[in-house]
Amino acid sequence: DLNNETIEDWNDHFKVNLMSGVELSKHFLPEMIKRDWGRIIFISSECATLVPSDLLSYSVSKASINVFSSGLAKLTKGTNVTVNTIVPGSTLSEGSKKFLEETALREKKTKDQVEKKFFNDVRDSSLLSRFLNVTEVANTILYISSPLASGTNGASIRVDGGSMGSIL
């Protein structure tokens, strides 16, 4: 929560999640526009929309990626350069694996039991009711980085197992 996150936590999240992308975009976008081709892909998070109260700095930094990406895409108007954001849901990353292992050990449960409880209690909006595997997210990144995605620009593409429910 807000009282447990330091200013350093906030600065770190913004440095890693937003400012690294700002710096890379400033460096590479002009050449992409000059060549009239390129792909800039940001990785956001479902936490940018489904904001957990214990992850405020992380969530706000991820939401800022969505805003930056949308604005940056407008600078590519009339070119073959695209700027998009991938918005993954709960993914079985190294951090998630560690969470499952530590929670299972602490609560004397199996990792499967912890995962089931997480999707029943915390992320009950997920239609998959399981963690995404990294390959599911990577496949979307592969597509959006390819020439096949030439018609997609300025989009936030959800790979969330249905957790953010939307008709758009």
Identify the residue ranges that each predicted region occupies:
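Active-site loop immediately N-terminal to the catalytic Tyr-X3-Lys motif
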Residues: 2-3, 50-56, 78, 129, ...
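Residue(s) in the substrate-gating loop at a strand-loop-helix junction
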Residues: 45
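Short C-terminal tail/terminal secondary-structure segment
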Residues: 50, 141-142, 148, 153-168
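Short, small/polar-rich loop/turn modules that mediate ligand/substrate recognition or access, typified
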Residues: 77, 82, 152-154
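Conserved mid-core segment of classical short-chain dehydrogenase/reductases
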Residues: 1-11, 54-57, 115
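Catalytic Tyr-X3-Lys loop
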Residues: 3-23, 37, 41, 65, ...
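Alpha-helical segment proximal to the catalytic Tyr-Lys
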Residues: 30, 74-75, 150
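Active-site helix of classical SDR
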Residues: 25, 61
